[in-house]
Amino acid sequence: MADVPNDAPEHCPGTSSDQAGKSSACQGCPNQSICASGATKAPDPAIEEIKQKMTSVKHKILVLSGKGGVGKSTFSAHLSHALASDSSKEVALLDVDICGPSIPKIMGLEGEQVHQSGSGWSPVYVEDNLAVMSIGFLLSSPDDAVIWRGPKKNGMIKQFLRDVDWGEVDYLIVDTPPGTSDEHLSIVQYLSGAGIDGAVIITTPQEVSLQDVRKEIRFCKKVNLPILGVIENMSGFVCPKCKNTSQIFPPTTGGAQRMCEELNLPLLGRIPLDPRIGKSCDEGKSFLTEVPDSPAAAAYQSIVQKIRDYCASHSASDDSC
């Protein structure tokens, strides 16, 4: 990963680049000599520290999306709620959407703060077995903007993984920003030694969303990140009275199903639109317990069971996880 120091010139190639310290853009940079020496290309010691920290976490799942507004954070939150509904399981939700942290609002934790202990930062708990960490807990107001360059974001993600006292955890769900950015590279790099079970990719039925999801899939393949499957969110609207389904966002090119068939990926399921999901998120409640008999809740539960089954088989075939 090519990190760019805060005091670097505009066209800095990055400290991990082959051109580090050698590019014309490096002339006059205070970091030129150390970059040219190759010292910056040494493995980040934090990777080994995080690997040791993550030995207490059984399963690590990233939630990705090609673009914003497709329900990625909503899914991350409800996946966490669903997994934590089994009181024998310990679940943690990590929000690495540094510039757009919505998890505190969705989980009903706005105004909560992180506390320091001898073991590190203590996450905020929704339930006894559901812990949450987000940069939103470090802001004085939810309206505060986080205006950070890549290196500072990377440093915060490193701190979340290394310094948070998660304890013994069965599932760590990582809610990422939309697209492919520094945050994605950082989380994959820092967890590379600890082992990631895989990524769940969220899309909506329209081609404009699927187009960006294909980029996300290529990213996963380039960084050797396994893909658990794709979820089509906002997939039709089921009328609560007549039970007929209307396509609010028509799958003009076949939707996620055709894309998954073409790319040989599992389609984990389709979640229909339900205005009550948005209402539950605004109120910081779990839609799965608020409206458990709805078609959307049934779709969620089916998808969550597939993720449970994947993780169970993954543990059986790979003792490192």
Swiss-Prot record:
What residue spans carry the region label Disordered?
1-23
Compositional bias annotation for Polar residues? 14-23
UniProt remark on cofactor binding? Binds 4 [4Fe-4S] clusters per heterotetramer. Contains two stable clusters in the N-termini of nubp1 and two labile, bridging clusters between subunits of the nubp1-nubp2 heterotetramer.
Record's Gene Ontology CC terms?
cytosol
Checking Gene3D superfamilies in the record gives: P-loop containing nucleotide triphosphate hydrolases
A GO molecular function term, named singly, is:
metal ion binding
Q: Which UniProt keywords apply?
A: 4Fe-4S, ATP-binding, Cytoplasm, Iron, Iron-sulfur, Metal-binding, Nucleotide-binding
Q: Where does ATP bind?
A: G66, K67, G68, G69, V70, G71, K72, S73
Q: Where in the cell is it found?
A: Cytoplasm
Q: Name one Pfam family in it.
A: ParA
| Recorded family membership | Belongs to the Mrp/NBP35 ATP-binding proteins family. NUBP1/NBP35 subfamily.
How would you summarize the oligomeric state and partners of this protein?
A: Heterotetramer of 2 nubp1 and 2 nubp2 chains.
What protein does this entry describe?
A: Cytosolic Fe-S cluster assembly factor nubp1
